[in-house]
Amino acid sequence: MIIPWREAWQEALYGSGGFYRRPEGPVGHFETATHGPVGRALARTLVGLAAETGAEGVVDLGAGRGELLSALRSVGFAGPLAGVDVVDRPAGLPAETGWVVAPGGDRLAEPTTVTDALGTDLGRALVVAHEWLDVVPCTVAQVDDDGALREVEVDDAGVERLGAAVTGDALGWAQRWWPTDEPGARVEVGLARDDAWAAVLDAWHPLRAVAIDYGHTAGTRPPSGTLAAYRDGEVVLPVPDGSADLTAHVALDSLRHDEIVSGAEAVRRWGPSATLPDHALSRTDPAGYLAALADVSAARTLLGEPYGRFAWVIARG
């Protein structure tokens, strides 16, 4: 069966046999900045942002297996925590950490359910969407030989064809944010991501929300699009069969925001220091010196490629 990419993408990631429901979880295929020592540096940066904004709790939207939530606790964040994802509560989370099972993609959990899991009002919380928007399925379109923008359809083996013309709000979005009439050019229509992000702000009403992701802005849109697949640490052909992650970069400038900063700027403003510790500490406290070196290494990883180029899209709820 051949269907629009957006529908196939949703089923491949979040359906009953979807990639994000697999027992090994995403970490079985790739790591993100939420893992290991880098995850603790990211957590410290988020704690700094929460402190500046007055947020008392944190909700991790697209929480995976709870890696960032665990990192937040490990760096001393004492406020309420809750995670939202498509799987049941992961083993090993601290007992006081809330968990919500959601449908996945742009289908959000009910705000009352999230509030109950967090144990405090969402208006006092920071919602973190780390690499969530890039896996919110969106319409994949391509300009045909006549200059018309048409949906790209795909079958279970990844074979594509051009389908119906893009119309309505989706076409309006493309004309405003990603205009092109070059035959063969691709457009990943970000309307679904814009709407999902707006729903987080308008339905959940957090004190602040931050979307941390890779993406592009007007003038840097890739003419061939960015749809990609990852499996077992490798880039593979995008096939919507549930065996691989499917992702596309985010049109950052179309998202509602109060501020957009780079990942590197976020670390410099709110995160741990990347300055080497005094070498004299190695003689008086060797273990502390080694721990400080590890912290600096993690901070420098966040400052460098690729995480330093990620965007932090910050908005009030």
Task: Please state what every model-predicted region is.
Residues 6, 10, 135, 218-223:
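Short, solvent-exposed beta-strand-terminating loops
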Residues 125-176, 224-232:
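A mobile, often basic/glycine-rich helix-loop segment
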